[in-house]
Amino acid sequence: MTHITFQAPYSWGRWRWVAMIKFMKKLLSLLFLALMAVSVMAQKNVYKFSVKDGNERTVKLKDYKGKVLLIVNTATKCGFTPQYEALQKLYETYKKQGLVILDFPCNQFGAQAPGTFRDIHSFCTGNYGTTFPQFAKLNVNGRSESPLYTYLKAQQPFKGFDLNSNIGKFLDEKFRAENPAYAKDPSIKWNFTKFLIDRQGRVIDRFEPTADMKDVEAGVKAALKMK
């Protein structure tokens, strides 16, 4: 009588070995990300970071040493998009005193920054006459976020929406429904979040998209007076 023996593709020993390798790879990946985060947090200013311009050329933020920077994640199809007008006015008013606005399109919020850099740049210059530097699209949250934004968020956590405005109330209710403790999370919540950088490259303030532009201007004026 012939006996037929069925053998599992992997013995238990080999299966455990494969599982262990997968676990170690995942652990090493997490450790690598953690070390990167620690390295980013150790920075004392924004000048160690580099970004890409619209032609994917590297731009070092140390090129802006001595300037007051307003770093903004933007979108062209957002309810806050008209803020471009106020940003351009702010830039024209204070650029001779040392203000530079750095515009970073981001498509992470409702896919409201579609298209290529050329599409976005043409929209902004054509509709709002923007003349401040605009950079390549990037991510501000998540595993693929820009190291610059990892640093910015660590230095200035979420400040809260303006609950005196209808849009501020709406956004607060929206995020609170998803996570009651959302305000403790430093992540970028929406388009047109602004970070204010002083002349030494330190992140000194954060303005949520619902912040009054008069408050943003006041912050810029104060930063320009700082030595």
Which role does the model predict for each range below?
Residues 25-33:
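Sec-dependent signal peptide recognition
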Residues 205-226:
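Non-catalytic, surface beta->alpha helical segment in thiol-disulfide oxidoreductase systems
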Residues 98-115, 131-142:
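Thiol-based oxidoreductase modules, predominantly thioredoxin-like and allied folds used
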Residues 41-62:
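N-terminal "domain-start" segment that seeds a small globular fold
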Residues 67-68, 76-77, 81-105, 124-128:
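Conserved helix-turn-beta segment immediately C-terminal to the redox Cys motif
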Residues 12-13:
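Glycine-biased, low-complexity coil/linker segments
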Residues 129-209:
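Thiol/selenol-based redox catalytic cores and closely related redox-interacting motifs
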Residues 33-41:
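Hydrophobic h-region of N-terminal signal peptides that target proteins for export
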